[in-house]
Amino acid sequence: MGKTKGLVAPVKKVDPSLDALFATSVGPAKPRPAAKYSEPLPTKSKKAPVPSKKEEDVQDEGDDEELSELDEEYDSEVGIGEDDEDDEAEDNSDSEDEAVATLEVVVEQGKVPEEDGPKRKRKQPDQHDNLEHKYLSKLAEDDEEPAGKRLKADEQSGEKKDTAKAEKKDDDDSESADEVPVHESLAPDAAQNEIEKANRTVFLSNVAVEAVTSRSAKKALMKHMASVLDKEAKPAQKVESIRFRSTAFATAAIPKRAAYIKKSVMEATTKSTNAYVVYSTPAAARLACSKLNGTIVLDRHIRVDSVAHPAPVDHKRCVFVGNLGFVDDETVLQVKVDEDGKEVTEKKKRTKQPMDVEEGLWRVFGKEGGKVESVRVVRDPVTRVGKGFAYVQFCDENAVESAILLNGKKFPPMLPRELRVSRCKAPHKTLRAIEAKKLKAQGAVPETMKKGNNGKKGPGSKKSDYAPKISAEAKTIAGRAEKLLGKFTARQVIGSDKKKTFNKQDRYQANQRRNHASGANTEATGPRVPGAYKSPESFILEGKRASAADGKPKDLKFKGAKKNKAPNAGGGKKKTGRAAARASKWKVQGKGKK
């Protein structure tokens, strides 16, 4: 017979822990009695009002008096004497000692007896309440006044700075409360702000590079720029800021801002730089341009010019100077062959003392020619390396004659090369302008002259192009508007007085509507072509239109007219012919009949 498997698991495989769970059973659940549900709910006791401290003190005093009276009455009734009271006091002291001993045992075991009844808990204030608001306000304060680096002396006086910071914040709050809010439509435009700032800004050239690297040199420059200001002027005149531009830095591997912070300037390229100085008022800027141009500061002549209204360039007072050095400290590389037959490159400086092109032109032409108004050395905008020529403009035309005599001369060490000095030509007499004029006469326009000149009719503009008339206000800001505001914004500002600009298609449609309204004959003249000239029928004249049927005016006299008229009505020659003969014959016959 085969073995049969039973449903009961073997005893060896039973887990004793699981078997212990089912060893004892509570039994089936018993239903609750009906009386449990029929009983009324217990009423909630109203909480007694919490008495104040004064009321509690008065109530405690009254309770003590009542209890003392009751104790005396009870003692007198029962007959307890002083001896009994002493025994009772001893018993109480013994019970207190026992309670203290039990309490120490409980504390050692770490068990605290629970009090009977529910314990009332007071709601504690949350320490992290309003945490987000505090964090955001702290971030706002950090954004308004970023913390800078503190020195040891500043750390010692930290409390004083905190108090000053709090006072300053209060002052700012009071000022902001006094300020009247302005609607965004009435707020000044960004372009207008730039123009207003340009009126207060002056341009400086041939500034010493020491002003970039040395703090004392920068202070000397600022002091010199503020030396001509009027101290009694209202509003007060002062120098607000200065910024340096077109500086030759040592390397192009890092941004210009980082190179400026590290003071890594390459004086071998050029010892001069440009700067912009912002004054508090336009009057101060005009005063600086009139009195500080050509003055000496940091052992260099500086050129001071207005940004909003730059000085005009007059070719009659300018000379062209060529054959100048490209960099101030030139190094010549010579390749030689040594004894072993190898090529060796030797570095040799052209001059022992480095040249200084821009300052040399100021000094030489100011001494030999006359008073110099400006010196413009043409350089590469990125590397600041010179292109070998410059323009010198004098205050007087007669100084040009003296400057031409310097042609072919050297002035070491600043100008060690032979100078090539010549007169400046008028813009329309330059080779480029003459070439463009010839191409225009032949019917071809060079690629560089095809684009229009900001709405002005130039060599590349067509006669049919619409050129709006520029207002006087737009002309005043057209000096350096593109450099200040950009091409797009400058065109908007210059053409701001025009509400709408019309192109060729718009003008063609307007002419068509006007011709249709006036009843002009478009069939005879043919369809209009955009950009073509207007036909005589499209012109609308005031008054009566002249025509050949109106006859001869009374005040019009022809050249061949005779003074003595013939007796006939025509006033001219007598008619001859068959018709005239018949008419005369008919007249004679008619008179005879009568």
From Swiss-Prot:
The keyword Repeat applies. Residues 1-190, 440-468, 498-594 are annotated as: Disordered. This is Nucleolar protein 12. It is found in: Nucleus, Nucleolus. Residues 111-135, 146-171, 498-507, 542-558 have a biased composition (Basic and acidic residues). Residues 200-309, 317-426 form the RRM domain. GO terms for molecular function: RNA binding. One of its GO terms (biological process) is maturation of LSU-rRNA from tricistronic rRNA transcript (SSU-rRNA, 5.8S rRNA, LSU-rRNA). Belongs to the RRM RBM34 family. SUPFAM superfamilies: RNA-binding domain, RBD. Residues 508-524 have a biased composition (Polar residues). Involved in pre-25S rRNA processing. Keywords: Nucleus, Repeat, Ribosome biogenesis, RNA-binding, rRNA processing. Residues 584-594 have a biased composition (Basic residues). PROSITE patterns: RRM (PS50102). Residues 57-99 have a biased composition (Acidic residues). One of its GO terms (cellular component) is nucleolus. Its main location: nucleus.
